[in-house]
């Protein structure tokens, strides 16, 4: 089944991850604060958008984030334009960023309080693993 996925953070790790999701038959839209990263994503046939507002809509079933630090995850999820306030309740949030446990718990609680499913899913395997689609994903979340 093809999912409609919003992917935020298409740097060295996120770009090949999003590309592999596209190759698997999913519909992907991507966003990054770096215009250079968006240009690279576009060259890989990924559909790019210029803002979070253009990315998150009622059609999105999954949001994946791959961000460099907890403060970035916090801003994307909980900030004034945070995606927790924009997604539908049936949307699954997957944070692949390697962030501190406190930030992960804070974001997870905020999502849970709104009835949104979220999993913390940091990865290991580096850029090569992302390119070869061989990353190890360590998943944590509620039993639902």
Regions found by a protein language model. Name each.
Residues 1-58, 62-65, 127-130:
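NAD(P)+-binding Rossmann beta1-loop-alpha1 motif at the extreme N-terminus of oxidoreductases
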Residues 5, 99-144:
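Rossmann-fold dinucleotide-binding core
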Residues 20-23, 43-45, 77-81, 107-111, ...:
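Short, glycine/charged-enriched secondary-structure capping and boundary segments
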Residues 31, 66, 97, 139-140:
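Active-site-adjacent beta-strand anchor residues
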Residues 48, 93, 137-139:
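Generic preference for hydrophobic
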Residues 52-121:
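Rossmann-fold NAD(P) dinucleotide-binding segment
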């Amino acid at each position: 089944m093809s999912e409609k996925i919003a992917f935020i953070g298409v740097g060295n790790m996120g770009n090949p991850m999003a590309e592999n999701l596209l190759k698997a038959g999913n519909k992907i839209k991507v966003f990054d604060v770096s215009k250079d990263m968006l240009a690279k994503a576009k060259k890989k046939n990924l559909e790019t958008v210029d803002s979070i507002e253009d990315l998150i809509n009622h059609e999105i079933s999954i949001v994946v984030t791959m961000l460099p630090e907890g403060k970035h995850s916090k801003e994307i999820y909980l900030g004034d334009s945070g995606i927790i306030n924009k997604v539908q309740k049936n949307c699954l949030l997957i944070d692949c960023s390697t962030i501190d446990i406190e930030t992960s718990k804070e974001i997870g609680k905020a999502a849970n309080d709104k009835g949104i499913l979220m999993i913390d899913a940091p990865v290991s395997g580096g850029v090569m693993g992302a390119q070869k689609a061989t990353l190890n994903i360590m998943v944590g979340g509620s039993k639902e």
